[in-house]
């Protein structure tokens, strides 16, 4: 059971200096993505790639960050580069990956922050449910496209590259617990069917797919080359609730006023997973700053079967789009 009041979170430890490092932040033009970029700059990072759907908005964010007195004084020479990445479209993901590989020699940190939570069933150009496309499919493709490049970055720096994926403990609310798969039913086809769309559980469904894919992928990756983990920052005071109906938004805004963490604190949790958590976090899910125990659903026979199917079906999907590296095959 989730406690109403969230535990207090301490800031990052002193002494973190990211000079010489490069980070990619998806969804960097607002909310936690914007604050992630700000805090990385405050930690003296040399280069941040702002991966955004709206390039003009991204450029305005760069101007805003350049105007920050602290950043201007202490890290004014940092490189901030805006690149287009629309997670709703596979071809945008592939263009972004090529652009990144062609222009940026080394990436040390890939922070997968972009995400949505829609309450209506809508489809992406791929034909998939839009929430699943943005939160899951496109992230899986992005990782597959970049994994050899991230491994090469680690070989050049002799330090593991980090992939940190923003998840949510909402995965525990998955609709699959109430509407289990039929014996021969495919998970991804099930999720795409309108009759199985559960508005208040779809976000959790998408985060379950992310978590299960990450856990399976981590088994294939050498953590001496790439460390991948996932975290839940808890309830954070962002604008994600703006998609709710007015009557629900009013209630949630009251709850957020009492319970939600400031965006700054939510980002401490993300950066803890990306910068502080050790190799033991590889393939793990972190709640706040701690590695969580495996959920009852995931460890159950039904959950294990779903995980196996998700991996196989996702590989089948991705193989139609790109040449997969050995780890994703």
From Swiss-Prot:
NADP(+) binds at residues 57, 86, 113, 203, 207. GO terms for molecular function: oxidoreductase activity. Its EC number is 1.1.1.-. InterPro entries: NAD(P)-bd_dom_sf, SDR_fam. It comes from the Eukaryota. Keywords: NADP, Oxidoreductase. Coiled coil: none annotated. The active site is at 203 (proton acceptor), 207 (lowers pka of active site tyr). Pathway: Secondary metabolite biosynthesis. It is an enzyme of class 1 (oxidoreductase). Signal peptide: none annotated. Short-chain dehydrogenase/reductase; part of the gene cluster that mediates the biosynthesis of the tropolone class of fungal maleic anhydrides. The pathway begins with the synthesis of 3-methylorcinaldehyde by the non-reducing polyketide synthase (PKS) tropA. 3-methylorcinaldehyde is the substrate for the FAD-dependent monooxygenase tropB to yield a dearomatized hydroxycyclohexadione. The 2-oxoglutarate-dependent dioxygenase tropC then performs the oxidative ring expansion to provide the first tropolone metabolite stipitaldehyde. Belongs to the short-chain dehydrogenases/reductases (SDR) family. This is Short-chain dehydrogenase/reductase tropG. It comes from Talaromyces stipitatus (strain ATCC 10500 / CBS 375.48 / QM 6759 / NRRL 1006).
């Amino acid at each position: 059971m989730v406690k109403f009041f969230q535990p207090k979170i301490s800031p990052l430890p002193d002494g973190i200096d990211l000079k010489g490092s490069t980070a990619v932040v998806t969804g960097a033009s607002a909310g936690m993505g914007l604050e992630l970029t700000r805090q990385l700059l405050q930690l003296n990072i040399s280069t941040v790639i702002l991966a955004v759907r709206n390039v003009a908005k991204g450029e305005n964010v760069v101007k805003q960050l350049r105007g920050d007195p602290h950043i201007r004084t202490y890290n004014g020479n940092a490189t901030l580069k805006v690149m287009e990445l629309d997670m709703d479209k596979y071809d945008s993901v592939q263009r972004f990956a090529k652009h990144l590989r062609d222009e940026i020699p080394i990436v040390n940190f890939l922070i997968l922050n972009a995400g949505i939570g829609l309450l209506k069933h809508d489809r992406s150009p791929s034909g998939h449910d839009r929430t699943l496309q943005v939160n899951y499919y496109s992230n899986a493709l992005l990782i597959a496209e970049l994994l050899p490049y991230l491994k090469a970055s680690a070989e050049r720096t002799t330090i593991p590259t980090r992939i940190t994926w923003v998840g949510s403990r909402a995965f525990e609310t998955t609709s699959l617990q109430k509407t289990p798969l039929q014996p021969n039913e495919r998970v991804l086809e099930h999720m795409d069917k309108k009759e199985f769309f559960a508005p208040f559980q779809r976000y959790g469904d998408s985060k379950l797919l992310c978590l299960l894919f990450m856990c399976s992928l981590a088994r294939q990756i050498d953590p001496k080359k790439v460390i991948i983990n996932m975290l839940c920052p808890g309830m954070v005071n962002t604008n994600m609730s703006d998609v709710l109906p007015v009557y629900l938004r009013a209630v949630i805004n009251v709850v957020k006023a009492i319970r939600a963490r400031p965006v700054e604190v939510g980002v401490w949790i993300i950066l803890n997973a990306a910068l502080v958590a050790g190799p033991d976090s590889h393939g793990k899910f972190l709640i706040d700053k701690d590695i969580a125990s495996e959920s009852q659903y995931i460890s159950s026979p039904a959950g294990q079967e779903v995980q196996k199917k998700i991996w196989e079906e996702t590989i089948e999907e991705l193989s139609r789009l790109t040449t997969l590296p050995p780890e994703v095959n």
